[in-house]
Regions:
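Structural recognition of alpha->loop->beta junctions
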Residues: 105-121, 163-188
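Substrate-recognition element of Asp-dependent hydrolases with the DxDx(T/V) motif
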Residues: 64-70, 74-104
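Metal-dependent phosphoesterase signature
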Residues: 30, 39-76
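Substrate-recognition "cap/lid" segment bordering the active-site pocket of phosphatases
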Residues: 91-145
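Anion (oxyanion) recognition and catalysis
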Residues: 23, 79-82, 109, 144
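Active-site neighborhood of HAD-like aspartate-dependent phosphohydrolases
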Residues: 1-51
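Acidic, Mg2+-coordinating phosphoryl-transfer loop and its flanking beta/alpha structural elements
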Residues: 133-169
Length: 191
């Protein structure tokens, strides 16, 4: 089975690392960066869209995407999916910084995520995978809307949303789902 795996907040702790970088760079004090309650959280941190994008570009160029360990369970989930014979494709909408692909490849290699392919695109539905895991509610809806099976990685910013999405606790949760006899399912996720 071909599995599309998002990076940020599925493998890599984007929110936590960005919070650390913002605090260290003096962009915002720690107290001004609460845990997000929704996916698009720039305004929760008091930043406008343009300012948010500019700081994220700077953070990426400063090495944000090449440092820091993966999320708990990500490596174990990856290993379990590999051991079950699945092909793993990193499919991310990362666009921050001057070299997002190189930064992503560097970080993946450093932590042993041996992807079969890497795709940087916001049109994830165009990547030929049997199932996707992502933390973005909009991305899950896009994938399902194009008839793709999509499983949402449970996070604080998507937990409260209504919907009958398949929900797992990160990549380890996806590995459990797919190795529990569900790996041959071909129907798209229920909408």
């Amino acid at each position: 089975m071909d599995i599309g795996v998002d990076v940020d907040d599925v493998l890599f702790p984007f929110v936590d690392r960005l919070r650390d970088w913002f605090a260290a760079a003096g962009v915002l004090p720690e107290a001004a960066m609460p845990a997000p309650t929704r996916y698009d959280f720039a305004d929760e941190w008091g930043l406008g869209d343009l300012e948010w994008v500019e700081w994220c570009h700077q953070a990426a160029d400063d090495g944000l995407f090449v440092t820091g360990p993966p999320l708990p369970g990500a490596q174990a989930g990856w290993a379990a999916l590999r051991a079950a014979g699945h092909r793993l494709h990193v499919v991310t909408a990362r666009a921050f910084g001057s070299a997002p692909a190189a930064a992503t490849e560097t970080w993946l290699a450093a932590w042993g995520f041996d992807a079969d392919s890497l795709h940087l695109t916001s049109a994830k539905h165009l990547v030929a995978c049997d199932v996707f895991i992502d933390d973005s509610p909009a991305m899950i809806e896009q994938l399902i809307g194009h008839g793709r099976r999509a499983v949402i990685a449970d996070c604080a910013w998507n937990r409260h949303l209504p919907g009958a999405w398949e929900r797992v606790d990160g990549l380890a949760g996806l590995a459990e789902l797919l190795t529990a006899g569900d790996s041959t399912r071909e129907a798209p996720c229920r909408a």
